[in-house]
């Protein structure tokens, strides 16, 4: 009975994550929860029930039988299913919980179809198309990233990845070992370096929104926008590095074993399934662990901002000494 929400001296604050976001461990726990692919299998009834619980709780309507654990479970499913700004149900392939299975499939294709021109073109087109769905689904409700900008970013990232993949393939065409297998990672790293800055070019030019402790807008900073874009790009590349580097290394070792070499059917049919499985195991850990590298809501002292931004903030009544910004994912 003590676990009932109505019996709590201090009610749980579901406007913030359950775990302390000031520590890496707390952020990792939060992202392990929010990227859990099992939430994709929840029914429409379960999703609507969780939405009702969360919506009612925010307005002060609390069921007398609702437990703290049930509240947090409802919040987890609600956050993974509904857009945080619009409240609309997100397309299931674009949800963060679809990152592991979605990237698992695309990685298997990237690592298994790297030898031929059609394979390279199709796998990188498929991968960037999946990324575009994720970016579009998770765009901010107040985002100024237009459909045109999303499309241009998608085209540039896709063409960049294909160009690098085909160029490096030509350089290592006489190599059938590890060097050729690592080409997809180099292509993906460049695609992220193109896609993310282009997607957020509006923030880079106009500045990232800065808010005080009361969530009131107090200014915009190009410096923090550049830092945030760099952090997100780094975390995306770091997310891909373990499974896109280790998977080829493991597969390269497997192909050299006598067991593999003496079984032609394995050489013909098993490479993509094996690499997909290995990548999936890696993705289960790298997705939340790399999303947690940097705090999503970060703070900065006003005196460390650009001089023009400092003047703007200090001209306000009771100006804050510390401001906050959302770096994004």
UniProtKB/Swiss-Prot annotation:
A biological-process GO annotation: serine import into mitochondrion
Any one cellular-component term (Gene Ontology): mitochondrial inner membrane
UniProt GO MF annotations: monoatomic ion transmembrane transporter activity; transmembrane transporter activity
InterPro entries reported for this sequence: Mtc
TM segment ranges: 100-122, 150-167, 178-198, 232-254, 274-294
Record's signal peptide: none
Membrane topology: Multi-pass membrane protein
Main localisation: mitochondrion
UniProtKB keywords: Amino-acid transport, Membrane, Mitochondrion, Mitochondrion inner membrane, Transmembrane, Transmembrane helix, Transport
Pfam families: SFXNs
Protein family membership: Belongs to the sideroflexin family.
Function statement: Amino acid transporter importing serine, an essential substrate of the mitochondrial branch of the one-carbon pathway, into mitochondria. Mitochondrial serine is then converted to glycine and formate, which exits to the cytosol where it is used to generate the charged folates that serve as one-carbon donors. May also transport other amino acids including alanine and cysteine.
Protein name: Sideroflexin-1.1
Lineage: Eukaryota, Metazoa, Ecdysozoa, Nematoda, Chromadorea
Gene name as annotated: sfxn-1.1
């Amino acid at each position: 009975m003590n676990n009932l929400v109505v019996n709590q001296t201090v009610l749980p604050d579901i406007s913030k994550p359950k775990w302390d976001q000031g520590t890496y461990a707390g952020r990792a726990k939060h992202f392990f929860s929010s990227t859990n692919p099992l939430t994709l299998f929840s029914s429409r009834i379960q999703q609507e029930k969780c939405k009702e619980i969360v919506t009612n709780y925010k307005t002060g309507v609390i069921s007398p039988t609702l437990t703290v654990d049930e509240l947090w479970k409802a919040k987890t499913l609600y956050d993974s299913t509904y857009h945080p700004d619009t409240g609309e149900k997100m397309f299931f392939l674009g949800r963060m919980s679809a990152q592991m299975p979605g990237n698992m499939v695309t990685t298997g294709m990237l690592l298994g179809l790297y030898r031929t021109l059609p394979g390279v073109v199709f796998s990188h087109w498929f991968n960037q198309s999946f990324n575009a769905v994720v970016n579009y689904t998770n765009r901010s409700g107040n985002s100024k990233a237009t459909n045109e900008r999303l499309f241009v970013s998608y085209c540039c990232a896709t063409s960049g990845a294909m160009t690098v993949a085909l160029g490096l393939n030509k350089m290592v065409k006489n190599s059938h070992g590890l060097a050729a297998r690592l080409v997809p990672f180099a292509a993906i790293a460049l695609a992220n370096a193109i896609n993310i800055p282009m997607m957020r070019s509006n923030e880079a030019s106009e500045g990232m929104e800065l808010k005080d402790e009361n969530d009131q807008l107090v200014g915009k900073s190009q410096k923090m926008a550049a830092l945030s874009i760099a952090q997100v790009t780094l975390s995306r590349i770091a997310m891909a590095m373990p499974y896109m580097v280790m998977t080829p290394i493991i597969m390269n070792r497997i192909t050299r074993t006598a067991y593999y070499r003496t079984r032609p059917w394995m050489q013909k049919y098993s490479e993509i399934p094996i690499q997909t499985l290995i990548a999936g195991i890696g993705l289960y850990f790298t997705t939340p662990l790399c999303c947690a590298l940097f705090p999503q809501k970060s703070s900065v002292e006003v005196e460390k901002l650009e001089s023009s931004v400092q003047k703007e903030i200090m001209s306000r009544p009771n100006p804050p000494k510390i401001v906050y910004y959302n770096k994004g994912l």
